[in-house]
Amino acid sequence: MAQYNQVTPEIVEKLQAIAPGRVYTGADVNEDYSRDEMPIYGTRMPDVAIDAMSTEEISAIMKICNENHIPVTCRGAGTGLAGACTPIAGGVVICTMKMKKILSYDTDNFTVTVQPGVLLNDLAEDALKQGLLYPPDPGEKFATLGGNVSTNAGGMRAVKYGTTRDYVRAMTVVLPTGEIVNMGASVSKTSSGYSLLNLMIGSEGTLGIITELTLKLIPAP
């Protein structure tokens, strides 16, 4: 395992300035942040947990952690079964659960733009109110959409409709350096540059943190 630096009080102060009132240390860190729903793969408490609220906050946090060589683990609802959100090196956990807004629908292009903390079930129900369907249907309905995309979740409908990968049009990602990158487009076809979008889908948080998604919808049957 790579060697990382310890989180110092000075680093905690810098993080608190970015996300005041939403940076937790010591006994204030929720025990759930030490694992996902399959603790058989191991548990470890992070040194710091942060409830992020925006792309800009996550960017600023990542810049500090990158400069100080602090390990970072991104976490959604923690419903996974493979230990992917377990902070095995300690460090900082960034939770995206407070980034839960359905930002907008584009009925001309049949897309919806959401933050990564929106739950799959919440989008499915809201889309139906618009006469639209978000087809991916993984087994865990209360997983976040950011987590679904990070794992390229499938489900029973995959045989007919495909997996999550087939419904991601665009995303905003914060790289480990803190750089903010926009990938993809809301339209159904674009040939501008490399398909970085498909590199991110299924990467399980190893390449960056997804902070916004534009997803494809279809007319509800």
Positions of predicted regions on the chain:
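N-terminal flexible segment immediately upstream of the FAD-binding catalytic core
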Residues: 1-63, 79-110
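Pocket-edge structural micro-motifs
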Residues: 25-27, 52, 74, 96, ...
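Residue-level detector of family-conserved "landmark" positions at structurally sensitive sites
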Residues: 25-26, 75, 123, 137
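Short, basic and Ser/Thr-rich N-terminal targeting/leader segments
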Residues: 66-68, 75-77, 143, 167
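Residue-level detector of anion-binding/catalytic polar loops
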Residues: 70-71, 133
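Glycine-rich, histidine-containing beta strand-loop boundary motifs that form or position
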Residues: 74-78, 85, 96, 116, ...
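FAD-binding subdomain of flavoenzyme oxidoreductases
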Residues: 101-105, 111-221
